[in-house]
A protein has these predicted regions:
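Hydrophobic faces of well-ordered beta-strands that scaffold small-molecule active sites
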Residues: 2-6, 32-36, 61-63, 115-119, ...
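Short, ordered loop/turn segments at secondary-structure junctions
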Residues: 8-9, 37-39, 65-68, 149, ...
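Active-site mouth loops of central-metabolism enzymes
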Residues: 10, 32-44, 113-128
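Active-site-adjacent beta->alpha loops and helix N-cap segments on the catalytic face
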Residues: 12-24, 42-48, 68-104, 126-128, ...
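Acidic (Asp/Glu)-rich catalytic clusters
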Residues: 19-29, 50-58, 105-108, 134-137, ...
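A generic, well-ordered mixed alpha/beta core segment in the N-terminal half of proteins
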Residues: 34-38, 42-69
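Active-site/ligand-binding-proximal alpha/beta "capping" segment
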Residues: 91-138, 142-144
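Catalytic-face loop-and-helix region of soluble metabolic enzyme cores
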Residues: 172-190
Length: 190
């Protein structure tokens, strides 16, 4: 294992914060990828969390829009979605230049991130995913992770088309441990 993904209240279910988890993993000698979603925080809080991550030496980030709160364990919570995954990537890239989204100069050394994004290679429209991938590359994505791949033929076709971007793609593979786990994923994972 080279990296450990640390989710951001995955499936809109409240859990321990990702930044604290990343710090614990880093202190244990692991390399975390800090996932940030736009669902729960506005642009001020997202930029603050990015700077906090950099201060703690957590430089691998995965920028996601996030699942709607209606899907989770607090469906009455108000989603934020001030930014989306592309604008969050742009914000991280801008912070690396020493400025924030408000045009303000940062104090001290600008952060440096390995910026990642998500792509869904098995969606109905590969072309739409390639357009999204291109927008994410233009915003600063340096690597991609796929959503779980269950259709190898679609994945192979997608990967052929995605070569044009020259970015590494980490494949999402989920191996159900039981039939019950498979049923749970089918019914509960967004």
């Amino acid at each position: 294992m080279h990296y450990v993904n640390v989710t951001d209240n995955q499936s809109s279910v409240m859990r321990l914060g990702g930044l604290a988890t990343c710090k614990v993993l880093k202190d244990a000698g692991l390399t975390p990828i800090f996932q940030l979603t736009c669902r729960d925080r506005n642009r001020i809080a997202l930029q603050s969390d990015l700077l906090s991550a950099a201060m703690l030496g957590i430089d691998n980030i995965l920028c996601l829009t996030g699942d709607h709160t209606k899907l989770g364990d607090h469906p009455q919570a108000k989603p934020v979605f001030d930014l989306d995954s592309v604008s969050l990537l742009h914000a991280a890239s801008l912070l690396e230049t020493g400025k924030d989204l408000g045009g303000n100069e940062l104090v001290g050394e600008p952060p440096k991130f390995a910026k990642g994004a998500v792509v869904s290679p098995c969606s109905d429209s590969i072309d739409a995913q390639l357009v999204k991938m291109e927008r994410k590359v233009q915003a600063g994505a340096e690597f991609f992770q796929t959503q779980a791949v269950f259709e190898p033929e679609k994945f192979i076709k997608f990967m052929e088309a995605a070569k044009q971007f020259g970015k590494p793609v980490q494949v999402g593979v989920i191996i159900p441990k039981s039939a019950g786990m498979g049923k749970f994923m089918n019914n509960n994972v967004a």
